Amino acid sequence: MKLTCMMIVAVLFLTAWTFATAEDPRNGLENLFSKAHHEMKNPEDSKLNKRCVKYLDPCDMLRHTCCFGLCVLIACI
């Protein structure tokens, strides 16, 4: 019984958190999914594509952050 109540409270809390942190609370999850769908249709708009480091800029060897080439010491080549 206690576990069931805790699960219900957790689900309600997570649902409220999702709607409270949404950019437009009226659309909630619908807005989130429409953005993801748009990024799938147009991969250039994806945020993941914008995180890479350009040529000769400082990079992170462990995370492979260079757009093209390799990260040697501290710069992308």
Curated annotation (Swiss-Prot):
Keyword vocabulary terms for this entry: Disulfide bond, Knottin, Neurotoxin, Secreted, Signal, Toxin
Signal peptide per UniProt: 1-22
Pfam families in the record: Conotoxin (PF02950)
GO cellular component terms listed in the entry, alphabetical order: extracellular region
Tissues expressing this chain: Expressed by the venom duct.
Compartments it resides in: Secreted
Propeptide: 23-49
Broad class of where this protein is predominantly found: secreted
Disulfide bonds: C52-C67, C59-C71, C66-C76
GO molecular function (one): toxin activity
KW Secreted (keyword) present: yes
Keyword flag Secreted: yes
Superkingdom classification of source: Eukaryota
Domains (record comment): The presence of a 'disulfide through disulfide knot' structurally defines this protein as a knottin. The cysteine framework is VI/VII (C-C-CC-C-C).
Family of the protein in this entry: Belongs to the conotoxin O1 superfamily.
Protein name: Conotoxin PnMKLT1-0122
